[in-house]
């Protein structure tokens, strides 16, 4: 299906026998009769106007006007090609209305898996709905393997016709998740011929080599058409050490810039000495002389040395679009795309605490050994290999009611996302603990695990006190096992919709759209490895996390209706005045139902000035991962940062302090378990997020300057019951102070008041967020001059407010725990066409921000006096350019381009960084990048 075909329009629909559904069907049947009569009586001119109607993202109605009450930014095919990108992620993330945590290939340490997520209004990828030809894509249902949100890099960019970005809440139109807005990717639906495309790119540092090969074939017949695409692309990695700003992890501590280094192998003795192995020790058992005093300056290691700055990736895309006209008014269609991607993330070797090493046979220190930490880069470098599959299939039939304006569409679809993350460099916990723990020399002269009379069968002791011994390295590897972690989501849906004219008013025809949707969402998690399979509390025998084998499913039934009522036309001060109403009912068997509606006004006081206003209700349903995600367990002792609010308790009975004496004598001294899991797993009830979205703006196309268009919009999103993460400290504290009574059943204490367990849901409804700002754009096209055609544009977003209920602070202009939010973001572009030549220039502006938030005490860096240090980050401008020429004699197009012309380095964020000492989801980490592309058509 492609929404670029005017005859039929794909929409969101539903299948449920309810009063609302019956009412919609009755309205559709009744409305079609007068509409048909009116169409027959109005003549051929009216029919021709109907054919000119198109669908616009943000409404189910077909419109003649491209500009409606919904603010939509369009990225056309030429702009995609000018970017030089072979995926959509970076292009979309650079739009000024995108902000906040947007995962991309530059986030190695956050395990992006090569995915690219988009976040409108800094509301998070989970609150930006991504559609392909008007239909939802599937993404991970939980954050166990990767961050939630749809991977826009999985969409085959070579087959994209355009991208429409709706910057307004649209739950009344599309349902859940459309809070910040909607990204609707429209795929090509027609092409005649065969084309081959080759792309190569490389940074001027000589790395990040990118290669793309693509094939495209299409054929159009009298009654249909077919277009098929296949592409493969890959990109080499870039290490942190390959960029000066990222070569070492740095912090600003006590007024000085210092390197953050990791500790190597160390032995802590009871007399206070800290020792480390000397180099060049012969294989075999060692004595105390094989160790020397540990010097942090020389014996520590660079934590960034082995880490990727840009993760390597290989991706294969295949796509198909086909259509067939069964009759002049009925058409069948199918859209399929499939993506496979493979990425690798690397982290340095981690240190292993050996609590029982004092009883190891090879211990040269005897009882003097207090603690031993082993770090083996040869054995414990961590590698994460992710293989992802994304499949989307939609098939349907659409048509029109002959002699009327009514069109209908019936479609069924399937979407699947699967991510298999294989972890290497980690040990089976019991195997490692047994091998490095207690051991002895048996009477047969063989060193064995355990103790005399209690030998651990199948275990060979490891001499961890000679970590460079090849036998030690091999033995450590022998305790390891590659373990997979599988996260899969599936979605099946049936959509039925219709739209057309109801009746005629003096100002024009009243249009309606109705639809029904039935959808099932399913997610599954698990592993093929028995050692990583978790029990109900998240425990397993693997030292890099466990996962519960499980599957869950929910069904969704929805119905919607939308009306466009023309109120005035061709009267003084009202060339056009339209009222747009819409409502959508959604029923989730997992938690209940909700109805979300919108009211929009389109007013043209004169023909070339549009004043628009929209008020919409929005919502987001809790994801299945939020409800049922796999648990994980941790043990907390009284030496950490946890502060029990019941310490010294003397007040009235408090549910957080069950069994705690109130005489002021209590102190929690016991270790306790923290089980973090899906909310339903721990008996915690989640509510959907609900809110409102507002937009007021104008679009002006002055007659005095042909080709000029100006727009400005004021927007606001108010979100109640926002789902956010929570920690065990907050669970206990919020129960104690009464701010969240629902947390109290999650706290368990023994008969003496000592904590035994705290259950923590993945998410909870934290409260209200209120976000406000402005969008503005200026676009001008100067066509058919002696020097060619010029087109220029500027789009900008101004964040004015990002606040939470009960919190007076404005987080805009800060890099805080809510993300990096420059107040200004803008993109300017200039394009030139003259015959076979085309050139483009693009500038990206990121406004000033502050490193850290003084208000929320988000303090990591410190001044000499110990006070928090906050650094102003200046504005950054990136310039990109491209040039292409069509060579008619060779049926080809050659294009070259440069991104980040000035080789601008990202600003330094010290300890506030999410990767490589900077904010990688905001700034360019690669540097100057040169690309070329050749397309040949046959």
What label would you give each PLM region?
Residues 6, 117, 428-430, 616, ...:
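C-terminal beta-signal and terminal closure region of outer-membrane beta-barrel proteins
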Residues 40-46, 55-111, 132, 137-143, ...:
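N-terminal plug
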Residues 142-145, 236-253, 275-313, 319, ...:
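Surface-exposed, low-complexity loop segments enriched in small/polar and acidic residues
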Residues 1-95, 214, 218, 328, ...:
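N-terminal Sec signal peptide and the immediately downstream disordered periplasmic leader
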Residues 112, 117-167, 195-198, 513, ...:
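Periplasmic plug
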Residues 2, 720, 800-801, 843-859, ...:
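C-terminal beta-signal and adjacent terminal beta-strands/loops
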Residues 190-193, 206, 222-223, 327-330, ...:
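Short loop/turn motifs that connect adjacent beta-strands in outer-membrane beta-barrel proteins
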Residues 579, 709-854:
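Gram-negative outer-membrane beta-barrel transporters
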């Amino acid at each position: 299906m492609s929404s670029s075909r005017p005859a039929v329009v794909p929409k969101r629909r539903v299948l449920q026998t309810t009063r609302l559904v019956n009412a919609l069907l009755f309205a559709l049947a009744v409305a079609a009769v007068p509409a048909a009569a009116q169409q027959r009586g109005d003549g051929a001119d009216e029919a021709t106007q109907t054919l000119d109607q198109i669908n616009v993202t943000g409404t189910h109605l077909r419109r003649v006007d491209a500009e409606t009450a919904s603010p939509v930014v369009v990225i056309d095919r030429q702009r995609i090609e000018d970017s030089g990108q072979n995926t959509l992620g970076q292009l979309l993330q650079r739009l000024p209305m995108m902000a906040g945590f947007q995962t991309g290939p530059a986030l190695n340490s956050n395990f992006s898996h090569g995915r690219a997520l988009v976040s409108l209004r800094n509301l998070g990828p989970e609150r930006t709905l991504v559609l392909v030809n008007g239909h939802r894509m599937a993404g991970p249902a939980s954050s166990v393997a990767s961050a939630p949100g749809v991977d826009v890099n999985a969409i085959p960019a070579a087959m994209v016709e355009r991208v429409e970005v709706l910057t307004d809440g649209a739950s009344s139109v599309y349902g859940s998740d459309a809070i910040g807005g909607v990204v609707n990717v429209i795929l090509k639906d027609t092409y005649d011929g065969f084309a081959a495309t080759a792309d190569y790119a490389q940074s001027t540092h000589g790395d990040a080599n990118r290669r793309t090969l693509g094939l495209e074939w299409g054929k159009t017949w009298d009654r249909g058409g077919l277009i098929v695409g296949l592409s493969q692309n890959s990109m080499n990695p870039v290490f942190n050490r390959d960029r000066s700003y990222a070569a070492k992890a740095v912090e600003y501590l006590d007024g000085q810039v210092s390197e953050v280094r990791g500790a190597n192998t160390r032995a802590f003795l009871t007399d206070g000495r800290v020792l480390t192995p000397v180099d060049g020790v012969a294989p075999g058992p060692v004595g105390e002389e094989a160790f020397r005093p540990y010097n942090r300056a020389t014996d520590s290691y660079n934590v960034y040395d082995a880490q990727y700055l840009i993760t390597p990736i290989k991706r294969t895309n295949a796509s198909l679009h086909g259509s067939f006209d069964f009759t002049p008014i009925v058409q069948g269609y199918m859209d399929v795309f499939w993506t496979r991607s493979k990425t690798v993330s690397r982290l340095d070797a981690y240190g292993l605490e050996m609590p029982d090493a004092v009883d190891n046979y090879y211990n040269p220190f005897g009882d003097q050994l207090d603690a031993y930490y082993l770090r083996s880069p040869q054995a414990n470098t961590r590698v994460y290999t992710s293989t992802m599959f994304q499949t989307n299939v939609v098939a349907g039939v659409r048509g029109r009611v002959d002699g009327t304006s009514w069109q209908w569409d019936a479609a069924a679809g399937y979407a699947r996302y699967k991510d298999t993350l294989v972890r290497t460099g980690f040990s089976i916990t019991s195997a490692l603990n047994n091998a490095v723990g207690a051991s002895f020399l048996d009477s047969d002269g063989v060193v064995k695990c355990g103790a005399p009379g209690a030998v651990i069968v199948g275990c060979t002791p490891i001499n961890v006190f000679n970590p460079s011994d090849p036998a030690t390295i091999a033995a450590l590897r022998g305790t390891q096992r590659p373990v997979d972690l599988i996260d899969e989501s599936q979605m099946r849906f049936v959509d039925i919709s219709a739209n057309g004219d109801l009746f005629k008013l003096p100002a024009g025809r009243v249009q309606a759209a109705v639809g029904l949707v039935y959808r099932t969402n399913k997610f599954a998690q698990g592993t093929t490895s028995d050692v990583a399979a978790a029990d109900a509390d998240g425990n397993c025998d693997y030292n890099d996390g466990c996962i519960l084998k499980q599957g869950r499913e929910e069904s969704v039934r929805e119905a919607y209706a939308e009306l466009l009522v023309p109120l005035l036309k061709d009267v003084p001060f009202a060339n056009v005045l339209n009222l747009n109403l819409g409502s959508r009912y959604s029923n989730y068997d997992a938690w209940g139902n909700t109805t979300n509606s919108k009211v929009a006004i389109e007013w043209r006081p004169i023909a070339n000035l549009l004043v628009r206003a929209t008020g919409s209700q929005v919502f987001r349903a809790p994801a299945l991962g939020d409800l049922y995600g796999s648990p994980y367990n941790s043990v907390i002792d009284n030496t950490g940062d946890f502060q029990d609010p019941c310490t010294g308790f003397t007040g009235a009975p408090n549910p957080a302090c069950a069994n705690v004496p109130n005489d002021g004598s209590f102190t929690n001294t016991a270790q306790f378990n923290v089980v973090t899991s899906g909310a339903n797993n721990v008996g915690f009830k989640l509510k959907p997020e609900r809110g409102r979205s507002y937009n007021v703006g104008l679009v002006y196309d002055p007659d005095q300057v042909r080709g000029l268009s100006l727009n400005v919009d004021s927007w606001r999103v108010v979100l109640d019951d926002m789902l956010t993460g929570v920690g065990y400290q907050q669970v206990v504290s919020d129960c104690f102070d009464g701010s969240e009574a629902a947390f109290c059943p999650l706290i368990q204490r023994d008969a003496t008041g000592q904590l035994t367990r705290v259950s923590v849901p993945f998410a909870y409804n934290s409260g209200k967020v209120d976000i406000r700002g402005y969008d503005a754009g200026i676009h001008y096209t100067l066509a058919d001059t002696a020097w060619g055609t010029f087109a220029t544009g500027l789009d900008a977003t101004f964040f004015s407010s990002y606040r939470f209920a009960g919190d007076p602070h404005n987080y805009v202009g800060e890099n805080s725990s809510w993300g990096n939010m420059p107040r200004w973001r803008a993109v300017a572009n200039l394009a030139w066409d003259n015959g076979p030549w085309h050139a483009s220039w693009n500038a990206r502006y990121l406004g000033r921000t502050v490193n850290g938030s003084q208000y929320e005490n988000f303090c990591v860096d410190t001044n000499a006096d110990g006070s928090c240090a906050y650094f102003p980050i200046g504005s950054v401008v990136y310039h990109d350019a491209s040039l292409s020429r069509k060579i008619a004699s060779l049926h080809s197009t050659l294009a070259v381009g440069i991104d980040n012309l000035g080789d601008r380095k990202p600003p330094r964020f010290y300890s506030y960084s999410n990767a490589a000492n900077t904010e990688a989801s905001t700034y360019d980490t690669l540097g100057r990048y040169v690309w070329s592309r050749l397309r040949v058509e046959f």
